[in-house]
Amino acid sequence: MTTALQRRESASLWQQFCEWVTSTDNRLYVGWFGVLMIPTLLTATICFIVAFIAAPPVDIDGIREPVAGSLMYGNNIISGAVVPSSNAIGLHFYPIWEAASLDEWLYNGGPYQLVVFHFLIGVFCYMGREWELSYRLGMRPWICVAYSAPVAAATAVFLIYPIGQGSFSDGMPLGISGTFNFMFVFQAEHNILMHPFHMLGVAGVFGGSLFSAMHGSLVTSSLVRETTETESQNYGYKFGQEEETYNIVAAHGYFGRLIFQYASFNNSRSLHFFLAAWPVVGIWFTSLGISTMAFNLNGFNFNQSVLDSQGRVINTWADVLNRANLGMEVMHERNAHNFPLDLAAGEATPVALTAPAING
């Protein structure tokens, strides 16, 4: 028997790099999307941390009244944020080299754009990397489809909404209380609670939580016993085992009798597709709602829609919500405008019908 040996030609440095990038044997898969994802997410993370700790106040409304968001300027973890870029900048691209100085860039909220743009590119690439790894492993592509829901939500609040409103100062602040402020102002200006797409999103998130808890509790309650009473049931499962670890027939029978027969899935694949699709579709709709309200296609207005026989208004919850909206609109950006737009747009109300007599 003769064995022929042939020396393998040494691969070029570029070829070695390509093989390393696309190798599924690495502990963490890099991928071509990862080549862009890693530097952008690192840049966004580092800038966010530095800005959250030490950024000076930002003139968010463009009226020379800076708002402090960093820890070194008196905030804590709850109240701190990376403040959105100034209304004086609007939708202009504002990298460091566009400012006259670093102080000007910080004063106008440049770090916000740097973080948001790099973050969005990073999460887009993360989604592409999920598809890429699935493709390399011969899997179906639904993981990246599910991830597209939070990606769409982030894109809506950080990019689409500011574009629709005409300024990145209207984007969501990068902090806890700043997020809540964004939600209140969004409700005041767009009545999002009365928008059908937001309602679908609420059903998706809360329904997804309910279905996840129901599924987890049913599976845990119908595990196939493989251990004794003194051992943890978790030891009854061996990674990669071929046998079912729970009795789907028992779970189906229990739930079918608890509700009714057709409320229970008898197919594990369709069940898990439903668990994935419900919250994803809901969040898609919410993202679409944010994107339409960005261009002021707002929630339903049922204010003063119920009248008695004399034409007097009978207040409904829509009217209560409208009062809350006006209150929130009065409070926010109190120095940027003299009067809330919703109140200023109505007919003028006379405050004095006749001039008072003086010394006469």
From Swiss-Prot:
Transmembrane segment boundaries: 29-46, 118-133, 142-156, 197-218, 274-288
Binding-site residues for Fe cation, renumbered to this chain: 215, 272
Biological classification of the source: Bacteria, Bacillati, Cyanobacteriota, Cyanophyceae, Synechococcales
Domain of life from the UniProt record: Bacteria
Protein name: Photosystem II protein D1 2
Post-translational changes noted in the entry: Tyr-161 forms a radical intermediate that is referred to as redox-active TyrZ, YZ or Y-Z. C-terminally processed by CtpA; processing is essential to allow assembly of the oxygen-evolving complex and thus photosynthetic growth.
Single GO BP term: photosynthetic electron transport in photosystem II
Protein EC: 1.10.3.9
Gene3D superfamilies listed in its UniProt record: Photosystem II protein D1-like (1.20.85.10)
Role: Photosystem II (PSII) is a light-driven water:plastoquinone oxidoreductase that uses light energy to abstract electrons from H(2)O, generating O(2) and a proton gradient subsequently used for ATP formation. It consists of a core antenna complex that captures photons, and an electron transfer chain that converts photonic excitation into a charge separation. The D1/D2 (PsbA/PsbD) reaction center heterodimer binds P680, the primary electron donor of PSII as well as several subsequent electron acceptors.
Propeptide: 345-360
Site (Cleavage): 344-345
Compartment annotation: Cellular thylakoid membrane
Free-text remark on how the cofactor is bound: The D1/D2 heterodimer binds P680, chlorophylls that are the primary electron donor of PSII, and subsequent electron acceptors. It shares a non-heme iron and each subunit binds pheophytin, quinone, additional chlorophylls, carotenoids and lipids. D1 provides most of the ligands for the Mn4-Ca-O5 cluster of the oxygen-evolving complex (OEC). There is also a Cl(-1) ion associated with D1 and D2, which is required for oxygen evolution. The PSII complex binds additional chlorophylls, carotenoids and specific lipids.
Keywords noted in UniProt: Calcium, Chlorophyll, Chromophore, Electron transport, Herbicide resistance, Iron, Magnesium, Manganese, Membrane, Metal-binding, Oxidoreductase, Photosynthesis, Photosystem II, Thylakoid, Transmembrane, Transmembrane helix, Transport
Chief location of this protein within or outside the cell: membrane
Membrane-topology annotation of the record: Multi-pass membrane protein
